[in-house]
Design a protein with these regions (language model features):
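Short, flexible surface segments
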Residues: 68, 95-96, 266, 322, ...
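Conserved PDZ fold ligand-binding element
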Residues: 89-110, 326-329, 333-334, 338
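PDZ domains, with a preference for the canonical peptide-binding region formed by the helix
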Residues: 101-134, 343-345, 350-354
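Serine endopeptidase catalytic core focused on the charge-relay Asp
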Residues: 143-315, 319, 328-329, 337, ...
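PDZ-domain C-terminal substructure recognizer with occasional recognition of PDZ-binding tails
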Residues: 40-47, 61, 94, 114-154
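A short glycine-leucine-enriched loop at secondary-structure breakpoints
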Residues: 84-98, 119, 316-320
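Interdomain regulatory linker/hinge segments that flank or connect interaction modules
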Residues: 6-56, 235-284
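PDZ/PDZ-like groove recognition
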Residues: 62-92
Length: 365
């Protein structure tokens, strides 16, 4: 599970069916940070050195990512300096679009866009948009508002921050984390990222989960170069991936494990590895179902927390645990990704084999 919070733009809306186990809110500056199949249960998304051997994770990290372009959340009505109501972007700009240019100037962030609007000499602007795989241009009449500002009536976002868990590190310093993608909370789209970083974090408090109300962990993240651990390069449905530059700072205890093939995984005893305070520990779970051909790749494992200590402290799986490694028979078999809303002792996981294939995709062998 991931806890996410937007850095700029309007606040995220709560989503109904599932929420990433990435601590559901990303934080800026110094901040704390199902499978819709036969079960029909609500779920929340919870973040190689030869022979598929990796260093096992379980450590929480702060995450900061910038969007590739400026993400459009919605359009809205605005009031002009004449007191009339206007909605200039309605039907022209859609939620989920990315603004990549204005009046032939490339823009990467919210600041670029507001600066261009502040210098506007005429009302008509041409926005260059990316909509899915298509690029298009739309003409919009900006509205002059009180104070001589021009506005387009568009809610936008250009970054996301939060807290999640590292799953593993390969022999060439590539990491896998979360086990699920980071989606925008307002539009539900998988966010296109232009880049990002991982940072040190410390867990400050735990909110215990209850039926119908998933718990969460809160951490302190200081986004500066002294606390930077590495680079985020990919945001996929199977997790986030990139490079760790400060390996010793993150992997204080370096434990090599082999990644299990899907066919090796079975129901029965297993453990998850996570940090609820100052140290990473293993907690007992049961694997109750294994589906190598799951419709959603990040829900191939169904698990139940059985460890009395973990149940007492968290109630089960909580937001912030996305990416927590799942171990069985001495091997890394997967990572926690989602929690059932109506039963926080149960959740989903992704196969570690799938994550390893994703982190290696596009790399030279």
């Amino acid at each position: 599970m991931t806890d996410l919070k937007n850095g700029r733009g309007k606040c995220w809306k709560k989503t109904a069916v599932f929420v990433t186990l990435l601590v559901g809110v990303f934080f800026s500056a110094m901040q704390s940070n199902g499978r819709g199949d036969k079960r029909n249960e609500e779920a929340i998304s919870t973040g190689s050195t030869g022979e598929n051997t990796v260093l096992v994770g379980g450590m929480p990290v702060g995450i900061y990512m910038e969007t590739d372009g400026i993400l459009v959340l919605d359009t809205q009505e605005i009031e002009g300096e004449d007191g009339e109501k206007y909605e200039p972007a309605r039907h022209l700009v859609h939620a989920g679009d990315y603004i990549v240019g204005i009046n032939e100037r490339a823009v990467e962030c919210k600041k670029d866009l507001t600066e261009e609007l502040a210098d506007l000499k005429q009302e008509e602007v041409v926005l260059k948009l990316r909509r899915g795989t298509e690029e298009l241009e739309v003409k919009i009449d900006a509205v002059k508002c009180a104070g001589s500002d021009h506005k387009l009536g568009i809610w936008i976002r250009d970054n996301v921050q939060g807290l999640g868990t590292i799953t593993f590190l390969t022999g060439n310093s590539k990491f896998g984390a979360l086990g699920h993608g980071i989606h925008d909370a307002d539009t539900s789209v998988l966010m296109d990222i232009g880049g990002g970083s991982l940072y040190k974090t410390s867990i400050r408090s735990i909110l215990k989960g209850e039926n119908g109300m998933p718990g969460s962990m809160e951490g302190m993240i200081v986004y500066n170069r002294y606390n930077r651990l590495g680079t985020v390069e990919k945001n996929t449905e199977m997790g986030i991936y990139g490079t760790i530059e400060e390996i010793d700072a993150l992997f204080e205890e370096q434990i090599p494990v082999q990644v299990a093939e899907k066919e090796e995984i079975h129901t029965g005893d297993a453990a998850i590895r996570c940090c609820l305070g100052e140290e990473v520990r293993e907690y007992g779970i049961q694997i109750t179902e294994v589906d190598p051909n799951a419709k959603e790749e990040n829900k191939g494992i169904v698990l139940e927390v059985t460890d009395p200590e973990l149940l007492d402290e968290t109630g089960g799986i909580i937001q912030g645990m996305s990416g927590s490694p799942i171990l069985q028979d001495g091997k890394l078999i997967g990572a926690v990704t989602h929690v059932f809303v109506n039963d926080p002792t149960k959740g989903y996981g992704i196969f570690a084999e799938t994550m390893l294939e994703t982190v290696c995709d596009g790399q030279e062998s």
